[in-house]
Amino acid sequence: MSTQMSVFLSHEVAAPQWGEKALVSFNEQGALIHTGESTDLTKIQRAARKFDVQGIKSVVLAGDGWDVEAIWAFHQGYRNPKKYSQLEWVALEEKAQAELEARIKATEFTRDIINKPAEEVAPRQLATMAAEFIRSVAPEGTVTARIVKDKDLLAEGWEGIYAVGRGSDRTSAMLQLDFNPTGDENAPVWACLVGKGITFDSGGYSIKASNFMDSMKADMGGSGTITGGLGLAIMRGLNKRVKLILCCAENMISGRALKLGDVITYKNGKTVEIMNTDAEGRLVLADGLIYASEQNPELIIDCATLTGAAKNALGNDYHALLTFDQALAQEALKSAAEEKEGLWPLPLAEFHREMLPSNFADLSNIGGGDYSPGASTAAAFLSYFVQDYQKGWLHFDCSGTYRKSASDKWSAGATGMGVCTLANLLVEQANK
């Protein structure tokens, strides 16, 4: 007897015995997902989650209606970090099949690397894995990569990455990857993508409680997401030169670790007083944004699991978008809508840049005053390291990267959310 479940789409309401609001019913042919008069992709994703929860380990999507978007919705819900399930679908035409496979490949990289234990993804491993993934999807000869590590970071002026990671026995690293499909080594760098790559965040001396620390293997989710986004953009035909910069460190406690009251002097001359060692993501991103600005690109995008404030505002279903460039923000929101991913703007204004006072340095690494808008002040901090921060810079505070427990749409763990939005945005802007 076959253990494979055939799953069909139905616009009809389930028979009464299945319940008034039944999403799934069964007959002699297999299972029916009742999507309503129009095909509701959210219902498909929720139904797929039910199949996984029930332990149905092999599914074939059968019958009519299974286009790219419907299959993609099912895949997202059915996918489990233990990866014991098998999914097959009806034949698609070549272009549609290529698009579906590209999405799956990019998001599988992102979800897998975020879900891995921190013991398996040290800072240098993260940089190496990201470079290997981009090489695997890019045309031959279009990718070069350099990993700056340990004391070489100091020699080249990347003080933030080194300072955050110096408390760990696992050396910090900066990935400088160059994707150049133009064939011209002197082609201008069109965009720079910067990712926060904190492979484990204990909080440092501003230590986290266990119930906040237990998911901190995922604090490199910004790097995982932006790498997946670039990979998907390449598979969709990105034709301009882009640099990927990952700022990788482990935030640990030791006699060498960063201390409260320390001052970091950055390559652009800015000094930063450390008032909270758990606000470390912005310290490593600052180096990446300085390097990005040195390339004089038209577009800078950074991705980071940066603040609890963004998650408190938006929950797990949206990433936060912060920028001074409102026209570019609208383009990003349009890309998210087209890809059916959650993205929501949070405020970022000039006065937020004045909310980082320090008695001993140019800036503090945390906002001051009562009711500090944490996501906004974190983005404001980053703006000091972007040369032209008012134009062409987007900051994604990745609230929806990882779930500690399953929901009705997602398994526990990484979601891959944002990968498709970033790819869409890159390709659309490059083609203008």
UniProtKB/Swiss-Prot annotation:
Its EC number is 3.4.11.23. It catalyses: Release of an N-terminal amino acid, Xaa, from a peptide or arylamide. Xaa is preferably Glu or Asp but may be other amino acids, including Leu, Met, His, Cys and Gln. It holds the Pfam family Peptidase_M17. GO terms for cellular component: cytoplasm. Its main location: cytoplasm. It is an enzyme of class 3 (hydrolase). Its cofactor is Mn(2+). It is found in: Cytoplasm. Mn(2+) 1 binds at residues 201, 278, 280. InterPro entries: Leucine_aapep/pepB, M17_PepB-like_N, Pept_M17_PepB, Peptidase_M17_C. GO terms for molecular function: manganese ion binding; metalloaminopeptidase activity. Probably plays an important role in intracellular peptide degradation. Homohexamer. Belongs to the peptidase M17 family. This is Peptidase B. The gene is pepB.
